[in-house]
C-alpha cells in the first residue's frame, strides 16, 4: 500500500511539472519581395530584416499599415500581439510592414519577430535613417493609401484590435 501511495504521489508531481504550450505562435522572418513599390521613387533605402534585398521606404504603395517598433520598446511589446491578431484577419486585404529601428544588433530584431508570432515583412533601420522620413519615436503606426500617401499617423501604442480595425476602415476604406 505504501508503494502504491508513493507511486501516486510521484505521478501527481510529474503531472504538475508539465508545461502548457505557449499562446504565442512562432513567428518567421519574411522576405520583402511581396511589397508593392514604385521603382522610380528615390529615398530612404532599408534592408529587409531577414537579410534579403530591402526597399526604398518612400516607394511603398498600399493599402498598407507600417508599424515602427524596436525590441527594446515596452509599448511595442505590448501592442505586437494585437498586430498579430489583426494580421490574421487582414492579410488578404492589405500589406502590413514593420520597421525595426535603432536595434543594437540585427539578431535582437530577428529574435523579436521569431518569438512573437510576427509573419509579415519587416525592414531593419539600425541607425535611425527613417527618422527624416517618418519622424522619431516608437511605436508609431502609419496608414498608407494605394498611391503611397500617408493618410494617417498614429503616435503611441495601439490599444486594441478594434482600434486597428476602426483606423483601417476610416483611413484606408477597408473593413476587416
Which positions does each model-derived feature cover?
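Short, acidic, Ser/Thr-enriched surface-loop or helix-capping motifs
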Residues: 48-51, 144-145
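Structural microenvironment flanking redox-active thiols in thiol-disulfide oxidoreductases
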Residues: 77-116, 126-132
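Thiol/disulfide oxidoreductase modules built on the thioredoxin-like
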Residues: 111-119, 125-176
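Short loop/turn microsegments at loop-to-beta-strand junctions
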Residues: 42, 64, 138-139
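Short active-site neighborhood of thiol/selenol oxidoreductases, capturing the structured segment around
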Residues: 55-77, 83, 96
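N-terminal targeting signals for export/organelle localization
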Residues: 1-47, 166, 174-176
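Generic structural signal for well-ordered beta-strand positions
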Residues: 54-55, 151
Amino acid at each position: 500500500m505504501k508503494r502504491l501511495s508513493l507511486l501516486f504521489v510521484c505521478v501527481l508531481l510529474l503531472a504538475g511539472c508539465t508545461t502548457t504550450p505557449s499562446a504565442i505562435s512562432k513567428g518567421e522572418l519574411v522576405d520583402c519581395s511581396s511589397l508593392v513599390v514604385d521603382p522610380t521613387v528615390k529615398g530612404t533605402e532599408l534592408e529587409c530584416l531577414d537579410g534579403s534585398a530591402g526597399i526604398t521606404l518612400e516607394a511603398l504603395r498600399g493599402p498598407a499599415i507600417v508599424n515602427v517598433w524596436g525590441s527594446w520598446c515596452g509599448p511595442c511589446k505590448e501592442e505586437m500581439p494585437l498586430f498579430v491578431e489583426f494580421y490574421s484577419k487582414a492579410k488578404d486585404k492589405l500589406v502590413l510592414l514593420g520597421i525595426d529601428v535603432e536595434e543594437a544588433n540585427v539578431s535582437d530584431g530577428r529574435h523579436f519577430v521569431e518569438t512573437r508570432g510576427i509573419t509579415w515583412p519587416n525592414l531593419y533601420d539600425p541607425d535611425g535613417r527613417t527618422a527624416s522620413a517618418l519622424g522619431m519615436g516608437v511605436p508609431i503606426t502609419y496608414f498608407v493609401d494605394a498611391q503611397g500617401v500617408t493618410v494617417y499617423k498614429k503616435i503611441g501604442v495601439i490599444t486594441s484590435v478594434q482600434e486597428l480595425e476602426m483606423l483601417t476602415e476610416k483611413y484606408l476604406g477597408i473593413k476587416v
